[in-house]
């Protein structure tokens, strides 16, 4: 057998064209400097709006405090009236309960002073129901 002639593939005359191997990505978005400028601008605007809101909130808070200060004498007068009414009712109840005890002075202070001493919760609500005493000492805490 004779050796067969092998035909080898050869490039075309003049060679192959150049091969494009680089990535051809389109330019997307803003540049880094413009994004930095937008970020700084957003931060400055955010700080400005927070400062503006804090000033408004402080103004509203001062207004609330002034309203509370204006209403405080009225609220204190109501509390004093309620306290004196309860003390008067307690004295009447004490007179009824202790009428048979000799040498008992109704309304005698346990403190040896002539100054006004605000009554304790136990003094005010000693002759009241347990619910009233708990409500006075703890308020609305059991709702939360």
From Swiss-Prot:
Short name of one Pfam family: GRIM-19
Keywords: Electron transport, Membrane, Mitochondrion, Mitochondrion inner membrane, Nucleus, Respiratory chain, Transmembrane, Transmembrane helix, Transport
Transmembrane domains' residue ranges: 30-51
Gene Ontology terms: biological process: negative regulation of DNA-templated transcription
Gene Ontology CC annotations of this record: cytoplasm; mitochondrial inner membrane; mitochondrial membrane; mitochondrion; nucleoplasm; respiratory chain complex; respiratory chain complex I
Membrane topology per record: Single-pass membrane protein
PANTHER family assigned: NADH DEHYDROGENASE [UBIQUINONE] 1 ALPHA SUBCOMPLEX SUBUNIT 13, NADH DEHYDROGENASE UBIQUINONE 1 ALPHA SUBCOMPLEX SUBUNIT 13
Purpose: Accessory subunit of the mitochondrial membrane respiratory chain NADH dehydrogenase (Complex I), that is believed not to be involved in catalysis. Complex I functions in the transfer of electrons from NADH to the respiratory chain. The immediate electron acceptor for the enzyme is believed to be ubiquinone. Involved in the interferon/all-trans-retinoic acid (IFN/RA) induced cell death. This apoptotic activity is inhibited by interaction with viral IRF1. Prevents the transactivation of STAT3 target genes.
Annotated family: Belongs to the complex I NDUFA13 subunit family.
Complex and partners: Complex I is composed of 45 different subunits. Interacts with CARD15, but not with CARD4. Interacts with STAT3, but not with STAT1, STAT2 and STAT5A. Interacts with OLFM4.
Protein name in UniProt: NADH dehydrogenase [ubiquinone] 1 alpha subcomplex subunit 13
Organism from which the protein derives: Gorilla gorilla gorilla
Lineage of origin: Eukaryota, Metazoa, Chordata, Craniata, Vertebrata
């Amino acid at each position: 057998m004779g050796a067969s002639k092998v035909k080898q593939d050869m490039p075309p005359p003049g060679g192959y064209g150049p091969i494009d191997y680089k990535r051809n990505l389109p330019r997307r978005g803003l540049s880094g400097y413009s994004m930095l400028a937008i970020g700084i601008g957003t931060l400055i605007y955010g700080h400005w709006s927070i400062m503006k809101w804090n000033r408004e909130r402080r103004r509203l808070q001062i207004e609330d405090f002034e309203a509370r200060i204006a209403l405080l004498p009225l609220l204190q007068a109501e509390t004093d009236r309620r306290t004196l009414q309860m003390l008067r009712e307690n004295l009447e109840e004490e007179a009824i309960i202790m009428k048979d005890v000799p040498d008992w002075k109704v309304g005698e202070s346990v403190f040896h002073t002539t100054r006004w001493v605000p009554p304790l919760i136990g003094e005010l609500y000693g002759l009241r129901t347990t619910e009233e005493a708990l409500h006075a000492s703890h308020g609305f805490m059991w709702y939360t």
